[in-house]
Each structure stands twice: as C-alpha cells, then as structure tokens.
Amino acid sequence: MISTAPADLPSPKPIPAFYCCYLLRSVKKPSSLYIGSTPDPARRLEQHNGFTKGGAKRTERDTLRPWEMITIIEGFTSRTGALQFEWSWQHVHTTRHIGAVETDQLNRRRKDPPVDQGSGIWTSTPKVLGNLHQLLRSTYFGTWPLTVRFLSTEAHSHWQRWTERADGLLPDTIHVELDFHAEGASVLDSNLPANDMTHINATYSGIQDHLEKSASLLNDSAKTLACEVCKKLLSPHGDVIVVCSQPHCHAVSHVKCLSQLFLRDEGSSGLVPTLGDCPACKREVTWVALMKELSMRLHGAKIATKLLKKERKSKAISDSRKSSKSGKKTANTYADILGNDYDDLDEDWMNSVNVDSGSEPLDHKFTNANNSTGRVEIVIEDSEEETFD
C-alpha cells in the first residue's frame, strides 16, 4: 500500500505545463530592464504593455512602453522553483547562490547608485545576463534542467561575450536556444515589438499523446505489464509507474527502477536524474517529461480528463476536415479548443485541482470532471523590486 499525506496537508499538484523567468527591455529606453516570472509569457507581455489588466506598476509608465521579452529561462517544474530563481536573479547582491560560484568580474555589491528611491539599481543588459550566467553555474541551480531562450540577437551577443570571459562553463543540464524569428517591429503596429510570444506553447498539449498512451496501457485489465528494468510484474493500482515518452514505445517501469538506471548511466550521485535512454526503445527521454505525465496522471485527474477529451475531439475534427472537400475553415479548430480551456490558467491555477488524498489504492485511471467552474478574470501580481532603470 502506498502511503498518502495527512488530510490536513495540501494535496500534491501536477507539474505545471510551462513556467519561466523572463527579462523585459523597454523599446523606448533600452537601459530599463525588468525581471519577472510567469506560466504564460504571451499574456504576461500583453499585461506589461497595457493591453490586458494586470502587469506591474513599474512597467506601467508610458515613457517605457512598449516592453519586449529578450530572454526567458524555461523548464521550471514548479512555481516555487521559478520564484526562487526570479528572486535570486533580482537580488544577486544578497543571494547565497552567487557567492558559491565565483567572485570574478561581477561584484555582488551595488556600486552604482540608484536613480531614485523607487527605481531600483542602475544596471545594463550585459550585467543582468552575467548575473544569469553565474546563477546557472551555481551548485543549486546548476542541477536544474533549464533552457535559456534568447529572443534578441543583441542579448545573445552580450551573452556570448560574457561566456568567453567567464571562469566556468555552464553545466550539461543547462541548454541555450536561439529564437530570433520574430525580431523587429510588429506588422500590425509599428510601435510594438514583433515578438509577442504567442509562438511559445505554454499549455499541456505537448503531453496529450503521452497521456493517451498511458491511459490505454494502464487501464487495460487484460494486459500484463512488467517493469522494463527489473522485469517484475507491475500493478497499476499499487505501483508508481512511468511510461516512455517516445511516441511508439510502450515501455513501462517502476519509477524507482528507472531512476536508478538513469542515475547509474549518468554516473551521478544525485537523487534525481536528468535524462537517459529508454531500456526498451533505446531512445533518449528526459526525466522532466516522464514526471510531467506521471504527476498529471496521479495528481491532476480533472485536467487530464479534459485533455484527453479534447485530444479525441480534435482528432475527430481533424478527420472531418480531411474528409471534407469544401475547403472551408472548420469551427472550433484544435487551437481554439485548447485555447478556450487554458486561457484562465494562471500562477494559481493549480489551486483549483481537487485531488482526493485518502488512503485508497493508487489508481492511474482518469475520472470524469463533472464540476465545472465559471470563468473569472485573473490578475497576475508580482513583486515591485525587479525593475532596473
């Protein structure tokens, strides 16, 4: 029997679909920078630029708008982790993580006087990116599977120059991605930056097929399942099971068995692996991908049920469109269906997931979510100490 948390403790939550820290830069005044975090960068940028309600007081000034996102750090597996990183990035002069790395070109003390009492620190894009480089090399954050996505060629150039003179290299867990396809001015409004972040998928659509496959495998009572590592029989109602994320692989394993295998192959003494080769298909899978599907299956039954319903509905729509020869656009496209479900998910969206924490056997089945909630307007609020003027 798998033990469960006491009833008075919060229920476990699924890993967020997406959470990132970001660096904003004022288009009108490029020396003005802002550090924040969000589960939805497209909507957050709209808020900062005043198109929707929310944002932060320090980005409301017309003398600084519009803002553009020039760098995002993605891959956080919880809101708490993203907020920890955000705070450390904002307060490099006091965070305990920087001091464990080096005391080279970046000085942890504030040498530049603030512009005024409410404007923060005088700084620059190179310095902020240098602080980021140090954080990613720290003992604490350096073990996280994060991706630094550059949306500005200028920001990436600053990063490269810093990398060349830094004392150390980024750990293998940190990846750098270039995303320059939307630089320049918007075709709709020349006063706005082209990169509105709408091309970034911040929804769970990426794990729908994985969830569908897991549901099919684990809910088939006629199918005998065995761990790919230890070869022992698996019980969908008693074992914590991970399912390979590769599309055509049906490998299942004990989470502990696969974790130990990946750690051994990595030669790591850590507790949580980063990635590894599936023992069945021999293709590389990331541990985060496996845990995101597992956490949704175990702790996000309502959302998982909605995802599977929309996956099946979208496939039906796709089949209908293929069979139609009219060439007309079908109403409620896949993007429309998915967008309607995720538009109101925010920093606090996980609080709406109601998962029983009783002492019942573990069940990998998804129950129907009968209780629907009305749409409400959600305003993102964040700290007031992350603007650098």
Swiss-Prot record:
The EC class name is: hydrolase
E.C. no: 3.1.-.-
Database matches in CDD domains:
GIY-YIG_SLX1 (cd10455)
| PROSITE patterns recorded | GIY_YIG (PS50164)
Q: Where in the cell is it found?
A: Nucleus
Identify the stretch(es) annotated as Disordered.
38-59
Q: Which InterPro entries match?
A: GIY-YIG_endonuc, GIY-YIG_endonuc_sf, Slx1, SLX1_C, SLX1_endonuclease, Znf_RING/FYVE/PHD
Intrachain disulfide bonds = none
List the Pfam families hit by this protein, alphabetically.
Answer: GIY-YIG (PF01541), SLX1_C (PF21202)
Is Calcium found in the keyword set?
Answer: no
What quaternary structure, including any partners, is listed in this protein's UniProt entry? Answer: Forms a heterodimer with slx4.
Its biological purpose: Catalytic subunit of the slx1-slx4 structure-specific endonuclease that resolves DNA secondary structures generated during DNA repair and recombination. Has endonuclease activity towards branched DNA substrates, introducing single-strand cuts in duplex DNA close to junctions with ss-DNA.
The protein here is known as Structure-specific endonuclease subunit slx1
Species the sequence originates in: Talaromyces marneffei (strain ATCC 18224 / CBS 334.59 / QM 7333)
Gene designation per UniProt: slx1
